[in-house]
Amino acid sequence: MSVFYPIHCTDYLRSAEMTEVIMNTQSMDEIGLSPRKDSYQIFPDPSDFERCCKLKDRLPSIVVEPTEGDVESGELRWPPEEFVVDEDKEGTCDQTKKENEQ
């Protein structure tokens, strides 16, 4: 003999409520765009362009001063002088090892 106990599932109730909301909402055809200025626009408003240009004139400029490591021509030196010195030292170490082996 089986006994059936009704199980109250809150997830089922939530899905039923969502179905009701979906069925009672307006379709996209019924929703009209409002003529407000902040509605979606593909092209910018010309008055916004003029306002932007006025603000653009007020923006501060960024000045970057050269540091000691910068080259005056603007070119980067690669490898840096520090690495070149280290490589020379490694080269002399390798030569010394070869001479010791012979």
UniProtKB/Swiss-Prot annotation:
Its main location: nucleus. One of its GO terms (biological process) is positive regulation of DNA-templated transcription. It is found in: Nucleus; Cytoplasm. Keywords: Cytoplasm, Nucleus, Transcription, Transcription regulation. The keyword Zinc does not apply. One of its GO terms (cellular component) is nucleus. InterPro entries: LBH, LBH_dom, LBH_dom_prot. Residues 18-101 form the LBH domain. PANTHER family: PROTEIN LBH, PROTEIN LBH-RELATED. Belongs to the LBH family. Transcriptional activator. This is Protein LBH.
